């Protein structure tokens, strides 16, 4: 965060693809005939056996704008969950989230907030990671009043929490390490990992730890605005920096957009063989959104769907990185804006994206959100348009696909803080209407939907989910088109 988070610390006035190493692996439109053949084979299989989806059970209500909870932390749930870092404790099997010190309507207590869950759906506030707040050495350097964007990793039996401290608009920042023998703390200060001052090329906040596949070597990716995102080698034994300096630059944006990139997070996917660098673009109070690049090496270069490196500052700054999630609004339902500063969990092959967001027009109410993350056939992460409620990937019978859908395309440049949905029609005869243009659709495999309109091919994953806006079950779509734009959709069960 750069960090306009200062706004949240004040009492509220009103509580109301690839380069030489990685080329675009997406199928071209010339593959349509082959895909149709596969679809026809699926038709025959479906005629023999019909499999109905299993939808998740009704989850607890979100209970947004709960002013009664402001001074009762046991009622917070996902409220105040800002810059969330997800972690599953292998010892207990419980899920934890560590987040920035934010409290709606009051000055936040410093110490890094901890939340706990058994199912990734219901969350309880545990307390603060550091009982004594900001360590004296860190306070003296940064003059910080709260802790930002903590991240955690377990090394042997030691839980290591990497915390950031700074003030809004300043490079006088530090990332420090605190350790504990429990994921719930208390965490004790060990030392500074990296610190920055005015004029340095990077800003020492927003840390994330990643382990190199094969070697076990730890790295820390970090940075916010200025010259962007760096990756620094970490001493596996101490958890502190293993090299002098600030590390290597792996992502940045030009000054024309204020260098607005932060919240880096890297995870490796064994199935694809790529490391994925997730970053947030824009302002956390308005156009904040999540993009991704990938690399065969943990230290980069990271490239997008079209092969552009995330360090490229010559190209249009809104055309670098695959935009996987941003502000959105389905029909007349509550919109969500400023989705960003995410973390990622691989839970035994089930993937999840965890981030914060704000209800449209209510920037003073941040909430943590958990969404299911799936993968395209060519290895790009796709995020569910709905909050996680326990849904599972499963075989989808094509007989339940036809109908009216609300569809959102995540355009590179947003004209407003949310992208509104539009109607599309998937007809029983396997034709469709999108933007008044006729196309066709078919099923590929157990749960993949292909839509062809003109020279654009859209490939989706279908997930039987809970519709949080309409409070019912439905089919949701998350996909990417042949130009690298991500698209969301959900079936409108009140219509056709």
Residue positions per predicted region:
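Sec-dependent signal peptide recognition
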Residues: 2-8
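Carbohydrate-active catalytic/glycan-binding domains of CAZyme proteins
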Residues: 20-496
């Amino acid at each position: 965060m750069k960090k306009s988070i200062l706004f949240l610390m004040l009492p509220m006035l009103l509580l109301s693809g690839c380069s030489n190493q990685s080329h675009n692996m997406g199928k071209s439109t010339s593959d349509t005939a082959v895909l149709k053949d596969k679809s026809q084979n699926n038709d025959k299989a479906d005629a023999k056996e019909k499999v109905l989806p299993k939808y998740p059970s009704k989850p607890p209500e979100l209970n947004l704008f709960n002013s009664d909870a402001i001074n009762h932390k046991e009622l917070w749930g996902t409220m105040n969950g800002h810059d969330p870092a997800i972690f599953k404790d292998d010892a207990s099997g419980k899920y934890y989230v560590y987040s920035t010190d934010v409290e709606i309507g009051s000055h936040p207590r410093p110490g890094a907030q901890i939340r706990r869950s058994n199912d990734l759906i219901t969350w309880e506030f545990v307390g603060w990671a550091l009982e004594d707040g900001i360590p004296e050495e860190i306070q003296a350097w940064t003059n910080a009043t709260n802790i930002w964007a903590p991240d955690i990793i377990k090394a042997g039996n030691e839980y290591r929490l990497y915390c950031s401290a700074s003030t809004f608009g300043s490079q006088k920042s530090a990332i420090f390490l605190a350790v504990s023998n429990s994921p719930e703390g208390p965490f004790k200060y060990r030392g500074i990992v990296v610190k920055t001052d005015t004029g340095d090329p990077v800003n020492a906040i927003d840390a994330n730890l990643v382990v190199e596949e094969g070697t076990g070597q730890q790295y820390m990716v970090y940075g916010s605005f200025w010259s962007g995102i760096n990756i620094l080698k970490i001493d596996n034994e101490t958890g502190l920096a293993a090299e002098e300096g600030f590390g290597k630059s792996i992502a940045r944006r030009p000054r024309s957009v204020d260098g607005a990139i932060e919240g880096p997070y890297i995870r490796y996917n064994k199935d694809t063989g790529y490391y994925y660098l997730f970053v947030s673009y824009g302002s956390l109070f308005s156009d904040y959104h999540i993009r991704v690049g990938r690399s065969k090496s943990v230290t980069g270069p990271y490239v997008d769907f079209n092969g552009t490196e995330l360090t490229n500052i010559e190209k249009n700054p809104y055309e670098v990185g695959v935009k996987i999630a941003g502000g959105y609004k389905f029909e007349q339902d509550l919109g969500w804006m400023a989705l960003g500063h995410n973390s990622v969990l691989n839970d035994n092959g089930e993937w999840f994206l965890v981030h914060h967001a704000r209800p449209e027009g209510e920037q003073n109410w941040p909430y943590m959100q958990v969404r299911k993350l799936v993968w395209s056939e060519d290895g790009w992460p796709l995020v569910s348009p709905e909050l996680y409620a326990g849904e599972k990937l499963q075989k989808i019978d094509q007989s339940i696909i036809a109908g009216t859908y609300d569809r959102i395309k995540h355009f590179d440049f947003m004209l407003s803080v949310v992208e509104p949905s539009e109607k599309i029609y998937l007809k029983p005869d396997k034709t469709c209407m999108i933007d008044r243009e006729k196309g066709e659709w078919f099923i590929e495999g157990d749960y993949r939907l292909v839509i062809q309109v003109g020279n654009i091919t859209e490939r989706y994953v279908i997930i039987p989910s809970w519709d949080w806006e309409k409070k019912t079950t439905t089919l949701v779509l998350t996909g990417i088109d042949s130009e690298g734009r991500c698209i969301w959709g959900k079936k409108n069960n009140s219509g056709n």
